[in-house]
Structure formats: C-alpha cells, structure tokens
Amino acid sequence: MSNEKYNIERNFTDMTQWLETPLGKNLLDIETSLLEQMINRRFGYHLLQLSCADVAVYEDSPIGHKFCLTPSTKVKNGSLVAQAEAIPLAAEAVDMVVLHHVLDYSSDPHQLLREADRVLIAGGYLLIIGFNPFSTWGVRHRFGRKAGKSPWKSSLLSSLRLSDWLKLLDFKVEQIHYGLYSLPVNSPGLIRYSSLLGKLAQRLNWPTGGIYVISAKKQALAMTPIREPWKAIPSKTKGLALGDNASIAPTQQHKKTLH
C-alpha cells in the first residue's frame, strides 16, 4: 500500500471515529439539518456522496438510488471504492453529488471538483459541505494542524473561493448556508450552552459558522437530449459498486484552470 493511499484510509478511519464524539455528533446533527433544507425537494435518479468518513448525510433526499464512494472496503455505507479524484463513473451519470468535507482533506481539490462536474448531469446539483476558515473552528484548525489529529489536520477552503471555482466550471451558486456556531470543544455542556448563544446567528445566517453548505446547479447544456442508462465504467481492474462491479478508470480533465 502506498503512503498516499494509507494516509487517505487513515484519515477516513480517524474522522469516522471522531464523528462518534459529542463534538462530532453535534457537527453531524447540524449538517443534516442544513442539508435537509437543500435536498428534500431535489429529485432525480441517482445521488452520489463522497465523504471524509463512513457516514451517510443524504437520508432526507427523495432520490431513489443513493450511494457512497469511499477509499476503503471496510465501511458500512460504501457502495463504490475508489479515490475521490478519479470517480469510476461515466460522464453525466448522476443527478446530485454531495461532497462531505472531502475537499477539506483532498490533496488535489481542483481535480476533485472537475470529477464531480464530469459525472453530474446538466441541470444537476452539487452540494459541498466544508469547514469555514473564518470561524472559531477555523482558528482551532489553524492551531491544531501540527498535532496531526482529525478533524484539525484538514486544509480549509473558504466558501468564497469555492464559489469562484464553481463559476469557472459553469455552476450557478444558488445557496450558501452557514451553521455550527458552538465552540469547538469536546464538552456536552459547553456545546449546548454555546449552541443556544448561536441560535440568533443561525437565524441570520451569519458567515461565521464553523461549517458552510453550498448548493450549486450545473449550467452547461447536455450534449444530447437522449439520456443513456446509468452505468459504471467497466475495466479489468475490479472495484466495488452497486449491482455490477466498477473500477477506477482514467478520466479526461476539464481544460479550465482553477486558481
């Protein structure tokens, strides 16, 4: 196993364990609440989630076929095993893509976004959940990265920077919601107290929350009005997928440059 693959799987395992802590559970509760407002009225055939941990944050979606891409086979919610920067699906294969903190931990966030764009149909939705660098959580990340422990070893991208990248890829950013105004401390009492203080900020959607959720619609026109049946890319190298096996296959990159 290469060092890069080992680090990806180790980060995945560490984040899965951290999300079982009081602070991690509070984070997931708030993220689920914010996502519910964005996905419960979005319809389609297929939803793909890429997450930093073994969790499913798409339960409120009415889309029938929901599945996860993970870096490891030792998961509960994994349906497709591959690297996030090389999604083994055909172009325009899914109606919605959910990126759950994967950009925070990606070594190549530009390529990851290009892959999400490639597999998403025209008119489909991309939802991005990330840690906000302009928050108390962002400060904690800045001083906690040297310790090398999850979730503080991630590299944070601001919602403004991601919005610029999405525009270059012909996405229309429709909503940005902020949340998690509680202090980043693993104490149930302090979490409850600071959450109460943050209710006004949540109501006003202040851009100082610990997380953000971006909803963006793909604007590019489809090449053909006839939609082909959904399928993964076949290859001699097998991967794990729903139904038929799928595998990691090289994909063509968009030529647009993200800065």
Predicted region positions:
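Conserved class I S-adenosyl-L-methionine
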Residues: 125-153
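Class I SAM-dependent methyltransferase SAM/SAH-binding core
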Residues: 33, 37-87
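A short acidic, Gly/Pro-enriched loop at the edge of an enzyme's catalytic core
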Residues: 85-97
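C-terminal lobe and adjacent flexible extensions of AdoMet/dcAdoMet transferase-like proteins
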Residues: 196-259
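Conserved catalytic loop of SAM-dependent methyltransferase domains
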Residues: 173-199, 207-208
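Short alpha-helix
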Residues: 143, 153-176
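A short glycine-rich, Lys/Arg-flanked "PGG" loop and its adjoining helix->strand segment in the class I
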Residues: 110-125
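Class I SAM-dependent methyltransferase Rossmann-like catalytic core
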Residues: 1-40
